[in-house]
C-alpha cells in the first residue's frame, strides 16, 4: 500500500475540539511533527478535515 507523509504546519491552539482530535488521530502532536501513514480513504478524509493545519507529501 502507498504511504504519504503528513506534517503539522500550524498550531492546534484555539481550534475546534474535533479538529484537535483529528490531529491526534493522525498521530500529530506539535508543529513540524511528521508522520508517515498509509494512503487510505479514511486517512484522506481526516487530512481533508484539517487541511489548513497540515502539509501532505505523496
UniProtKB/Swiss-Prot annotation:
- What are the coiled-coil residue ranges? none
For this protein, what is any one GO molecular function term? Answer: structural constituent of ribosome
Single GO cellular component term: cytosolic large ribosomal subunit
Cite the entry's keywords alphabetically. Answer: Ribonucleoprotein, Ribosomal protein
State one Pfam family annotation: Ribosomal_L30
A Gene Ontology biological process noted in the UniProt record is:
translation
Domain of life of the native organism: Bacteria
Tell me the subunit arrangement: Part of the 50S ribosomal subunit.
**PANTHER family in the record:** LARGE RIBOSOMAL SUBUNIT PROTEIN UL30M (PTHR15892:SF2), MITOCHONDRIAL RIBOSOMAL PROTEIN L30 (PTHR15892)
What HAMAP family does the database record attribute to this sequence? Ribosomal_uL30_B
- Give the family, as the similarity comment puts it: Belongs to the universal ribosomal protein uL30 family.
Stated name of the protein: Large ribosomal subunit protein uL30
Please give the organism.
Answer: Vibrio vulnificus (strain YJ016)
Amino acid at each position: 500500500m502507498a504511504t504519504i507523509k503528513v506534517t503539522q504546519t500550524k498550531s492546534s491552539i484555539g481550534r475546534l475540539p474535533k479538529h484537535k482530535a483529528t490531529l491526534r488521530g493522525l498521530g500529530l502532536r506539535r508543529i513540524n511533527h511528521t508522520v508517515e501513514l498509509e494512503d487510505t480513504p479514511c486517512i484522506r478524509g481526516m487530512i481533508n478535515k484539517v487541511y489548513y493545519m497540515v502539509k501532505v507529501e505523496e
